[in-house]
Amino acid sequence: MQYLDEPVLGYHSFSTTTADVLKPWIQQGDVLLIDGNLRISLAIKYLTQSTWSHAAIYVGPESGLTDEYGNPAELIEADAGKGVIAVSLNKYDGFNTRLCRPVKLTNVDRQTLMDTLIASIGRQYDIKNFIDLIRFTFPQPPVPQKWRRRMLALGSGEPTRAICSTLIAEAFEQIQYPILPTVTRENAKEIFHIRHHSLYTPRDFDISPYFEIVKPTLAKDFNYRNIEWSKHNQPTDF
C-alpha cells in the first residue's frame, strides 16, 4: 500500500483553478475530479485511459465535518490508506481538477445524497484492488482495452469497502440519478438500467451526459476581449 501511495517523479501540474477560485462556485453534490500524482493514480489513469485518477464529492462547510487535523472539511473521498474520510478543499489546491455537477437535484434527493455520503465515513478502502493496481504501474502493462474497466471492478465487493468513484456512484444510485446507465428500447420507450456502482471510474463523471462541467473562469462573465496580452510576440515555453 505504501508503494502505491508514493508520488510519481516528473509530475507537473498545469492547474489554473485554485481552491479559492473554486469555493464561490462549487455546490453540494458536485463531483471534483483530480489528476493525481501518486503511483495508484498512474495505474487508474492507464486502466481508464483518462486524465482523471481520483474523485471526491463536495458536501460543503454546512455539513460540520472536520479533517483528521480538526480543520473544516468540505469534501468526502475514499483514500487508499485511510478509507472514507472528510478532507478540506484546499487539499487539492494546485492540482489539475474538473468540476462535474448533477443537475436539477431536488432538495430531498440532495439531502439523501449528503446523508448517504456522511454515513459512509469510516468505511475501509477496497485493498484487494491493490494486487491488480500494482501490476499496472509498470510501463506498457499487457491488458486489452476491453478488460481494463473490469480490472478496476475487481476486489472484495464487500459493502464496508469502497474506492473513490464507486463510493460516489453508490450514493447517486441511492437517489436514482444517472451517470452512465445502459439504455434499451422497449415498446418505443427508452428504459434506463443502472450499472453496478463497482464498474464506475472517475472519468465516467466527466463523460456523463447527465453532469454539467463547471469552469469557474467561464462562469464569472469571461470575455476574451478583456484579456491584456503580453507585448512580446514570442510564445512562452511553459
Question: What role is predicted for each listed range?
Answer:
Residues 1-238:
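Cysteine-nucleophile amide-bond enzymes
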